[in-house]
Amino acid sequence: MGKPRGLLLLALAACLLSGNRVMASELPACLSLTPGKTMESVLVASGVEPPELLTRLVYAESISTGLGDDPLVHLGIAWGVMNRARLGNLSPSMQTTYGRGIQGVVFKKGQFNPAVSERSQLSREFLCPKDVERWRLARAAAETALNGKGNPFIRTPWEREHNLSLVVNFYYPQSVQAQGPLAPWEGNKALKFVGDVPMGEKVLPASRIRFYRLAHPPSDLKR
C-alpha cells in the first residue's frame, strides 16, 4: 500500500507544481527601473505593446484604490483610460490634456501617480505584477475596454451619437493617497459628477470610484 500511495503523492505534487508554473506564465515580464531611466523609457525599450501597457496600469491602479480584488474597479479604470485615448484621437485639445494613444495617456505627467511614478512603491506593481488573480482581472478589463463594445459610460445623447464617452476624470476615495471623500476638482464647472455606474447587471458605486463627465464636448472634434 505504501508504494502506490507514494506514487500518488508524487503525481499530485507534480500536478500542483505544473499548475503553479502555468499560473506564473500568465504574468508579464518583470521589469526594472535603472538609474537615469523613466518608467516610459523602460516600457518602450522592453517592447511592451499597448494592450499589455493598459493591463499593467489597470493592475497597479486597482491596487492603489485599495480595492484590487473588485472586477468592477478594474473595468472602471480600463474604460476611463480608453475614454481618454479615444477622445484624444479625435480632439487635439483633449490629446494635449490627456495624452496621445494609450502610451500617451498612461504616461501623461501627473495623471496616474503613484502607479507610474518613479518615486512610488506602487510603481513596482506596474513594473512587476506578481498576483495572478489580479492580473487576470486587469487583463479581462483591458480586453473589454479595448474592444470598445458596450461602453457603460456612453449615456448622453451626444455620446450615443458620436459613440464616444466624455467621462474622462476619475478619483479613488478609498485610496491611501486620497485627500478626502471628494475629488479636489469637485466644484469645477467644467466637470459633472456621474454617480454610481451601472455595468451590466451590477453597479460600480461612487464610493469606490468617482467619475466625472466633461460638461461640454470638445469644440475641435474631428470626424
Q: Which residue stretches match the model-derived regions?
A:
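N-terminal export signals and maturation junctions of secreted/periplasmic proteins
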Residues: 2-3, 7-51
